């Protein structure tokens, strides 16, 4: 099993026991697969932007989504864009490239993302975006690193020389993401 698949399996397995509230539905009786080939298919797609949701699975009491994200180079000294997600935790597993991930702290000019946008409807639910004034934490990240970002915590990348690409596993206790979603390139 390659490193990407092993990392994804480990993160999903750990999160499958995540605490939840609200609904009390029965979890699925079968596992959901996302193969290394699936990840590469979505990564290599010519369209789809920097945040590409692969699947959203209804786990009963909560949803879990898995996406792959890519951030391009940042300009030294440029303002750092900050985003938070009101309901969804994100677990990043870096698969290639590197950069500095900023989290928490203070943000200027925060505004809600459009409710009808794909990022809100499919990827992360209600979210806000602004510019970092002062981050609470900074850390260099590269292949193999995992970072867990709670709901409401602003985050963004800087010091990206070429790119940073990562898998994001998103526990969704409020069912704001569309259960059953499958990236169009992965529908069989």
What is each of the regions a protein language model found here?
Residues 132-136:
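Short alpha-helix capping/helix-loop boundary micro-motifs
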Residues 162-180:
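A short hydrophobic beta-strand segment most commonly corresponding to one strand
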Residues 139-161:
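Conserved metal-binding segment of the jelly-roll/cupin
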Residues 1-8:
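Bacterial N-terminal signal peptides that target proteins for export
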Residues 82-83, 89-93, 138-139, 146-147:
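His/acidic/aromatic-lined binding-pocket segments of jelly-roll/cupin-type domains
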Residues 86-101, 105, 114-129:
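Short, conserved beta-strand element in jelly-roll/cupin
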Residues 10-19:
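Hydrophobic h-region of N-terminal signal peptides that target proteins for export
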Residues 20-86, 181-188:
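A short, N-terminal "cap"/entry segment at the start of jelly-roll beta-barrel domains
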């Amino acid at each position: 099993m390659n490193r990407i698949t092993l990392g994804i399996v480990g993160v999903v397995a750990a999160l499958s026991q995540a605490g939840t509230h609200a609904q009390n539905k029965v979890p699925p009786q079968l596992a959901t697969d996302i193969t290394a080939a699936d990840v590469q298919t979505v990564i290599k797609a010519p369209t789809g932007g920097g945040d590409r949701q692969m699947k959203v699975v209804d786990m009963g009491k909560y949803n879990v989504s898995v996406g792959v994200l890519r951030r391009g180079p940042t300009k030294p000294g440029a303002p750092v864009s900050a985003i938070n997600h009101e309901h969804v935790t994100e677990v990043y597993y870096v698969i290639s490239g590197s950069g500095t991930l900023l989290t928490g702290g203070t943000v200027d000019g925060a505004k809600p993302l459009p409710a009808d946008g794909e990022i809100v409807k499919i990827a992360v639910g209600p979210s806000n975006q602004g510019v970092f004034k002062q981050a609470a934490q900074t850390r260099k990240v590269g292949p193999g690193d995992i970072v867990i970002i709670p709901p409401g915590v602003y985050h963004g990348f800087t010091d990206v020389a070429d790119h940073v690409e990562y898998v994001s596993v998103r526990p969704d206790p409020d069912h704001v993401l569309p259960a059953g979603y499958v990236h169009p390139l992965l529908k069989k």
